[in-house]
A protein has these predicted regions:
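Switch/communication elements of ASCE P-loop NTPase nucleotide-binding domains
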Residues: 81-174
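Phosphate-coordinating catalytic segments in nucleotide- and nucleic-acid-processing enzymes
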Residues: 1-105, 109, 117
């Protein structure tokens, strides 16, 4: 089941298997696919950089229990920056400063790519609520394409916006 993405993004909240696949390395296959998806979506992001921070980089007061330190480090060890181009120069922007739609694309895109790679079902409530209709259609179209969906993954979603199905993009594959 998909977890809604709001104003913040917590990659560990995506779900452990998806986030572990993304975060095990900035060279992982799913991270490369996610970078391509963000580029194709044309949200102004030129590249994505991830940096892993070690436990030693976090300075905790002595009174903070070890269990809380580990939990904090696990939740904050990855720093994600979206790289934009401005006047030919790279301009990194922290993920928390990105738009809700870009955060949604990063989080939902990871889930979509994970289920496309594994096969199975992705269920989402109000999948299109935090994103532009064209971006929503792009994510859904990945399920109707045999190249991007060779394992016949399925998408089940709810929406109150009937306009997203007006162009026939949601037909059965055959």
């Amino acid at each position: 089941m998909a977890i809604p993405i709001g104003e913040t993004i917590n990659l560990k909240a995506i779900n452990d298997s998806v986030s572990d696949n993304i975060l095990k390395s900035d060279k992982s296959e799913i991270f490369g696919q996610l970078k391509r998806l963000v580029h194709i979506a044309d949200v102004g992001v030129h590249d994505i950089h991830m940096q892993e921070h070690t436990e030693e980089e976090f300075k905790f007061p002595d009174f903070v229990p070890e269990s809380q330190r580990k939990q904090f480090v696990q939740a904050h060890k990855w720093e994600v920056k979206m790289i934009h181009k401005s006047n030919g120069k790279d301009f990194p922007l922290d993920m928390d400063l990105e738009s809700t739609g870009t955060k949604y694309l990063f989080g939902m895109g990871a889930r979509v790519l994970d289920v496309l790679n594994r096969g199975g079902l992705l269920a989402c409530d109000e999948m299109n609520i935090a994103t532009h209709s064209e971006l929503f259609k792009l994510l859904v179209s990945l399920f109707n394409n045999t190249r991007s969906n060779p394992k016949n993954a399925q998408l089940l979603f709810t929406t109150h916006d009937a306009s997203v199905i007006a162009d026939g993009a949601f037909r059965a594959r055959g």
